[in-house]
Amino acid sequence: MSEPLDLNQLAQKIKQWGLELGFQQVGITDTDLSESEPKLQAWLDKQYHGEMDWMARHGMLRARPHELLPGTLRVISVRMNYLPATSAFAKKIKNPKLGYVSRYALGRDYHKLLRNRLKKLGEMIQQHCVSLNFR
């Protein structure tokens, strides 16, 4: 018989794994985001989502994770800086002969980078808790 899962210990491991994968911050919350839903709707109503039409079509799923993936118990959120501390970016922007491109547009597509790291984090969690799924 296996030991019962210590959820606090698991949360600490998930946060540590996230840091090891290069995320600057990892947060874990439950799925009741009802307090945030009116703020999200107001943000969408003001069209702050710009050309991201999928946000208007499916934005409320962000406030209702249980509708996105039935059976969801927790939401894990991560943060990753676009501009590494070791970047020589500050020196480059002082050069009047250079044009500027947003940091997120340089190099590898950050969506792919995040997706790959999140997949690795999900796999690490699944190795530790085989009965859990992730998306």
Regions found by a protein language model. Name each.
Residues 1-135:
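Auxiliary alpha/beta "docking" domains used to position bulky ligands
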